[in-house]
């Protein structure tokens, strides 16, 4: 029986999820295999792809349009904790139905490090701060059906830390969960990789709103809607020119520089804001 070749000391095998371009990695690996494995011995490089796909799949965000359109403000740490919960809710391979989603989520420091590329000490502080901010904050939903036009509720029912284990268990308010998993079948989806370089929650929320209409590339809204849903400060609420100068235009510049979208906007005669955008890959 043929002996399998050993990997030379000078060859380094990196984790697949560190490669932005898996095809480049597989091509390099194929060259190494061709030079080092004995004739007749083959290596299935395709077997390495699921790990990459799984990692990227779990870095995808899928949130209900009710959440995209909700009024809330969270600090960046809390927004990231919310992302980790949404990833668990929608990309659990064992989950068959959205109705199976429980309000309990485990938030680990190690996951925060992996997805947001920060040191463990920073992640530990961020997770604690994020969970605390969620626990102290409320969110306002605007259901299209039902008795109420606005529903304001606290995010969480409970949060508990496991000391020494680097993890938190949080329980969402059971009345909030239907809005998270979707009262309808309409969702906003995007990749965490696409907006990971945005460090302003209000800019992130603008990006999420654009992604809601990604299929058409057109979104029409108003100054009042942006101020209400993104909880913009009074100076921007009271002066549309100030809002454009200090929020909207800098936000679109960041989105154009750091995400896959290319966005422009115009102001209609009636004051509405018309956004046109497309994916840069198109």
Predicted regions and their residues:
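Ala/Thr-enriched low-complexity intrinsically disordered regions
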Residues: 2-6
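Charged, alpha-helix-forming regions
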Residues: 8, 12-282
């Amino acid at each position: 029986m043929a002996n399998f070749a050993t990997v030379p000391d000078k060859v380094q095998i990196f984790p697949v999820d560190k490669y932005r371009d898996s095809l480049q990695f597989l091509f390099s690996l194929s060259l190494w295999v061709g030079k080092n494995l004995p004739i007749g011995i083959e290596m299935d490089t395709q077997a390495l792809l699921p790990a990459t796909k799984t990692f990227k799949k779990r870095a995808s965000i899928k949130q209900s349009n009710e959440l995209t359109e909700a009024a809330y403000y969270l600090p960046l740490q809390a927004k990231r904790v919310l992302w980790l919960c949404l990833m668990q809710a929608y990309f659990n391979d064992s989950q068959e139905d959205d109705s199976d989603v429980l309000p309990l989520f485990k938030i680990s420091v190690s996951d925060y490090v992996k997805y947001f590329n920060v040191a463990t000490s920073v992640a530990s502080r961020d997770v604690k701060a994020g969970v605390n901010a969620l626990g102290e904050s409320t969110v306002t939903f605007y259901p299209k059906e039902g008795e109420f036009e606005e529903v304001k509720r606290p995010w969480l029912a409970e949060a508990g830390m496991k000391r020494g284990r680097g993890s938190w268990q949080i329980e969402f308010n059971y009345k909030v969960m239907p809005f998270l998993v979707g009262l309808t079948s309409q969702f906003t989806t995007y990749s965490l990789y696409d907006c990971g370089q945005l460090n302003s929650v209000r800019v992130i929320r603008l990006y999420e709103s654009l992604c809601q209409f990604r299929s058409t590339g057109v979104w029409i809204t108003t100054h009042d809607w942006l101020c209400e849903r993104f909880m913009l400060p009074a100076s921007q609420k009271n002066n549309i020119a100030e809002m454009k100068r200090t929020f909207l235009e800098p936000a679109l510049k960041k989105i154009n520089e750091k995400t896959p979208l290319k966005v422009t906007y115009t102001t209609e005669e009636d004051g509405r804001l018309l956004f046109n955008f497309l994916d840069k890959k198109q």
